[in-house]
């Protein structure tokens, strides 16, 4: 299992704490029915941390017409909205909720140039709260395709996720097989796409980052 680089510090700290806990346990008592459950619990916990920071390699099919899912999760919002931060127009919003068991790496949804990238401080409301998109800690990235269509996606911190890693800078040339960022410990991704796009998913669908086609751009 390949581990994402964002997990290295957390994994190292967790490993040290687990070693100390088990050392103290085995040093302070000889009772096997105390030692073994603690050892088992800490090993399971360490495995879950490793599993959270897994970094799967996916065969992303690059297609200029496709808007691919930037993350794993479940599609919890699919509606027409007015995007107020940058696009300033009506568009479709697709929101993907990530549980702690999902892969938390993000991919770019389209090919093009990053024309906007901004990090916002904020609250830590639960990721499914309607106001989390505008009030939580978040990063907003806008990509303009060669056909001048713009797709905005937003990394949103949740009640557990307290760190967003945004790898985008204005002027970057990006494509769909490139890594866009990482969010630690559960959160949400909002994607805002042109109204003329043809939606290819339905509400409550299970989404696979880098593979699921959310929509097709009108070209």
Please tell me what each predicted stretch does.
Residues 1-219:
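Contiguous, well-folded functional domains in the mature portion of proteins
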């Amino acid at each position: 299992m390949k581990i994402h680089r964002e997990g290295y510090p957390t994994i190292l700290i967790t490993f040290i704490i687990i070693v100390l806990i088990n050392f103290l346990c085995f040093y302070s008592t000889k009772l096997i029915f105390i030692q073994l459950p603690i050892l088992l619990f800490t090993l399971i916990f360490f495995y879950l941390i490793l599993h959270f920071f897994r970094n799967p390699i996916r065969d992303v099919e690059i297609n200029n017409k496709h808007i691919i899912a930037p993350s794993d999760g479940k599609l919890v919002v699919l509606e027409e909205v007015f995007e107020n931060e940058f696009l300033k127009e009506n568009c479709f919003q697709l929101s993907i909720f990530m549980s702690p068991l999902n892969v938390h790496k993000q991919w770019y949804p389209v090919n093009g140039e990053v024309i906007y990238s901004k990090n916002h401080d904020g609250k830590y409301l639960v990721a499914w709260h309607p106001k989390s998109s505008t009030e939580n800690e978040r990063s907003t990235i806008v990509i303009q395709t060669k056909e001048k269509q713009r797709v905005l996606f937003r990394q949103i911190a949740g009640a557990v996720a307290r760190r967003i890693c945004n790898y985008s800078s204005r002027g970057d040339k990006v494509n769909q097989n490139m890594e866009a960022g990482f969010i630690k410990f559960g959160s949400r991704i909002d994607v805002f796409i042109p109204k003329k796009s043809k939606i290819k998913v339905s509400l409550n669908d299970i989404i696979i980052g880098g593979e699921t086609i959310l929509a097709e751009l009108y070209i």
